[in-house]
């Protein structure tokens, strides 16, 4: 903790990483699966045991999510913002990872679709890295999630 004359400023650890994945499927189809948060519970229940949609307005939705990435388990409130077939952004607006941000950009290429993913994960309290898991393990677990989504896209 950092103490100032106006109070306490909390230090929140930030884990940032980027991933790139090529999927042999049309961008439109890949986007539909990756941004289909309301079916995560059915499509990839090992990562999302429960999803509850709180509100939807246009291309923006507020969703309550239970996310499991290896040893890291989070219950969070997130805002999904979609720009069809190009961009899917997730802003964590509540929970122990509040302030986290995930950006998925979908680029059409001759082989299919390239996904560029930027993850900025903020963890507080007992969730701090490396206590729960190290950054390389977190990247590996997130990559496993991407691999499972890739299988769905390519079938």
Regions found by a protein language model. Give the residues of each.
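Hydrophobic ligand-binding cavity/cleft-lining segments
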Residues: 1-58, 144
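A conserved amphipathic terminal alpha-helix motif
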Residues: 120-155
